[in-house]
Amino acid sequence: MSVYDVVIVGSGASGGAVAYTLCKAGYKVAVLEKGRLINREEFSKDELAYSRRDLVTPNLFDEYHTIEEKIEGEWVTTPTYESGWSFWNGNIVGGSSNLMSGMLHRLHPDDFRLKSKYGEIKGANVVDWPISYDDMEPYYALTEELVGISGKVDKHPFEPPRSTADFTQPPTKENAVVKLFDKSCKALDITPLVTPRAVLSRNKPGRDACYYSNLCGSYGCSSGAKGSSREALLKPALSTGNLTLLSNTYVKYLHSDNKDEVNHAVVVDTVTGKEKEIKGKIFVVAAQAHESARLLLNSASEHHPDGLGNSSGEVGKNLIFSGGGSGQGELHKETLKHIKFKELMTTGLFVNRSILDWYFIDHWWDGTFKGGSVEFMFEHQNIISRARKNGYEEGKLVWGKDLGERLVSRFTEQKSIRFEVFNDWLPNDDCFVSLDPTHKDKFGMPVGKLRLEGHPQDVKVGNYIAKKCEEVLEEMGAKNIYSSVSSSPPQNLVAGGCRFGNDPKTSVLNKYCRSHDVKNLFVADASFMPTGGSVAYTWTIYANAFRVADHIVKQLQKS
């Protein structure tokens, strides 16, 4: 049986970054991915496949989670095959990085020291990170170049410092609506920023620039422009000859022969059903935060009775999501100002605008507290989801001629512009993942049970920013403006569960994301994050995984 230098569980952003670095350094790497390989040319823009079918995620009757929510003061557990609330995100080679919208920001230096900046927050388990922004910055820059992030550096008081003057990839093409948006923001004394995006505006070797298909977020990319782990990292890693990519490989648990070392992974071929062992010198878990914690808990043994690497009892604890919410307004043909309606209706081009003005809030009336960021975009262009929004009016079903007229109007006489608010989801004692005592997946392993409870501050911040965004849409002349902020978590933005820190009693990982308990075990996905910042996690996930990979190279060189 082959013994790999490094075995990586998961092929998403973090798994790809570690694999790329190790393969380029000459080490033999195995990547274990539960899902199948979908090649670039197979990514279609099929609305049915992506909105109504299980194309890139497991069927919920085969693999699922159970969700604990507080209802009328009582914790109620529901399996997701009943609720339809899926916490799977892109179970294919490259993971959910294949399907992201790619709107990325770096964390701010103060995100690494939230407790020092704001002190204790009642009901929240906020801690400072064991590293600083300066430790991460070189890897943000590396991600920008290797993954391919397009953008433009705009001067802003909350823009993190950079080691490079600007992006090497200029911004992607923009819809004319940005003229109206920028003008409206300036009228309100708000600074509009060009959104950094993991989408190529120019060709890179082996990858073509964006062709503006109009179907980007939630869809795979058929040009290679999107900065997925599969395109940007795994394909170059495969070309080294050092990577063994094992798709359709479900990892049941990690086996340890002694207390401080993992020996092998026990896996199942999801096509044949055959079980086997994969041996390695170092193991890297990168299966997405809640699933990484579940894997460690399912890897309990006589040496690790409470779960692998869980002497602290912290595995699965302090799960975090992204706080905030969303909203939108409609730009109508008859009331549109400053731009032509034909320009607005041009398909494929991005809105490409962010606002960071409320990232840190220090106001004489509203007070001082951590805020968040905002991304602006057109509503999702999947025609099915857009059409379904018109099926009801005042709670009554619309059908026949009335429905047809509503659809024609929606698709030809207006365009909806959306915003998404990202703010910290404060870690707390009632947001965690554990093993469900009764439910098991089709492979016989206990499923993850997610208790989902937010902190009141999350909703307060989300509402504060959403109201500001509504003012922007109002200034743009939008109609039917609304926003929705709640403590319900977005299932595509999950972090925490194996937080890193200097104290083995209160954290799972050290500052290099190596287990405090197990010397050859690393966790490289978003699990490490003790706090999430107020932006989407992906750029930070990539950057930290490159940082961790560099440390693994040094560890292998020493041995």
Question: How should each PLM-predicted stretch be described?
Answer:
Residues 2-121, 125-142, 291, 305-331, ...:
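N-terminal glycine-rich phosphate/pyrophosphate-binding loop and immediately adjacent elements
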Residues 55, 62-70, 75-85, 98, ...:
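Conserved redox-cofactor binding core of oxidoreductases
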